[in-house]
């Protein structure tokens, strides 16, 4: 196994070196492509918007076995591309093509909306088109000056909800005993193992934050589209009557409800964009540059020299767990080492910690918090930027900051802690399996799935 692992690592490193060599040769032997005048920036988001991409094995990427459904796009890349385009005279229009955007998240999209507004304020137009808009796709599309829909398309908005499966009866039938210890009456994470339904406390808490998210979602549409404050709710709650009125034509319903400005086939969209951009490429399509290529070109053009004074930026995205972890998971040891490096680096004068985490290991959270405490003790300011969520352990580490910044829809705070473990001694007893033995103390051998915990041990 060690030989196979070593061979795999060698192959990955060799492939990486070959790719880097090819890129260097290509850049040194050819001119960097330029962006033509009167070009549209195509914001074609493919995948989910994230603060940090999950780690994917390079060999898996190389042989093309990465799951397309797991594609991710950095929010900061979108923001940077739009900001560059705003001041670029070659870019005259921004086109939102969001059919392949899987998940946005209202908090992340709210960070993109201001840069889209700044793009419009510069006198440039934003046009959105799509076949069918999902809930997240439509919110981002609604930030455009003009929104178009395919004649066979529709706008699918459902609202926010939280529904869970509950296992109490199943566990009782299987005679599996779940020992749950929690602090905080609103800490409902383990309710599925303790109840057959959602508690009133959980319903109350969930309705509060879901209602806040929904208000932010709907107002972001109605204000931008100049609709009545209740327009989105009326669209959803009255969809049956609207479909009957328009003979099942979902696109016409969207137009009549003010959600889109019109319907266009794909060829009509292309012709319209040619008229707007004023340019056409050799294939007969409107002149456009994808935002990823554009961002790469602009970063090459505007590369900044290394300075002595820097602000460090570290992203903590995912569940907080112990040890070393890849990108997309907050490893206690991994993140604390990055913070320590920033503390020891004299050129780093301050640190911004971006947190998007619902928490996890209390121990790992404390390891991270301690490193942040040491960083501040060195006199380096710490600013926390919260993403969609910074809860429980995520808030524990954020509380160490000099300043904390969040979006209107960030879920943050901590409502308690819990611990849980199952025992199956009764289940095994039904099968004729028993456990017995001796130990040198009252605790010896009393940690596992097949033992019965005494009252004092549970305490």
Language-model segments: which ranges?
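Small-residue-centered hinge/linker elements
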Residues: 1-243, 270, 274-459
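Extended, domain-scale alpha-helical bundle/helix-rich regions
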Residues: 244-250
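A structural motif shared across PLP-dependent enzymes of the aminotransferase-like
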Residues: 261-264
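Extracellular glycan-binding segments that recognize GlcNAc-based cell-wall polysaccharides
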Residues: 267
């Amino acid at each position: 196994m060690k030989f196979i692992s070593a061979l795999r690592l060698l192959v990955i490193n060799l492939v990486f070196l070959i790719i880097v060599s090819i890129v260097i040769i290509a850049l040194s032997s050819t001119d960097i492509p330029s962006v033509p005048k009167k070009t549209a920036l195509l914001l074609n988001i493919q995948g989910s918007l994230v603060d940090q991409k999950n780690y994917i094995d390079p060999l898996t990427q190389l042989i093309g076995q990465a799951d397309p459904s797991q594609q991710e796009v950095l929010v900061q890349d979108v923001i940077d591309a739009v900001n560059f385009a705003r001041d670029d005279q070659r870019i005259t229009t921004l086109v939102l093509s969001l059919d392949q955007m899987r998940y946005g998240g209202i908090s992340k999209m709210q960070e993109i909306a201001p840069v889209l507004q700044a793009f419009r304020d510069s006198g440039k137009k934003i046009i959105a088109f799509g076949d069918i808009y999902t809930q997240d796709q439509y919110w981002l599309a609604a930030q455009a000056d003009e929104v178009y829909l395919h004649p066979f398309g529709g706008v699918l908005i459902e609202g926010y909800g939280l529904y869970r499966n509950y296992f109490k009866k199943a566990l009782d039938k299987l005679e599996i005993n779940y020992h749950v210890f929690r602090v905080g009456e609103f800490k409902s994470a383990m309710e599925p193992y303790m109840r057959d339904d959602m508690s009133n406390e959980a319903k109350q808490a969930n309705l509060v934050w879901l209602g806040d998210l929904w208000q932010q979602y709907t107002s972001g549409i109605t204000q931008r589209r100049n609709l009545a404050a209740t327009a989105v709710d009326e669209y959803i709650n009255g969809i049956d009557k609207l479909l009957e009125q328009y003979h099942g034509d979902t696109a016409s319903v969207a137009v009549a409800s003010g959600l889109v400005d019109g319907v266009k086939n794909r060829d009509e969209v292309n012709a319209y964009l040619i008229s707007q951009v004023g340019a056409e490429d050799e294939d007969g399509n409107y002149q456009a540059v994808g935002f990823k290529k554009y961002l790469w070109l602009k970063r090459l053009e505007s590369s900044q020299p290394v300075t002595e004074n820097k602000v460090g930026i570290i992203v903590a995205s995912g569940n907080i767990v112990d040890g070393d972890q890849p990108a997309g998971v907050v490893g206690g040891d991994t993140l604390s080492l990055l913070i320590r490096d920033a503390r020891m680096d004299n050129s780093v004068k301050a640190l911004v910690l971006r947190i998007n985490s619902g928490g996890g290991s209390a121990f790992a959270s404390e390891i991270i918090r301690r490193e942040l405490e040491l960083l501040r003790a060195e006199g380096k300011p710490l600013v926390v930027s919260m993403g969609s969520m910074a809860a429980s352990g995520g808030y524990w580490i954020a509380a160490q900051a000099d300043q904390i910044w969040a979006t209107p829809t960030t879920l943050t705070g901590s409502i308690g802690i819990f611990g849980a473990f199952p025992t199956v001694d009764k289940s095994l007893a039904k099968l004729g399996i028993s456990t017995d033995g001796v130990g040198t103390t009252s605790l010896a051998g009393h940690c596992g799935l097949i033992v019965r915990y005494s009252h004092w041990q549970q305490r």
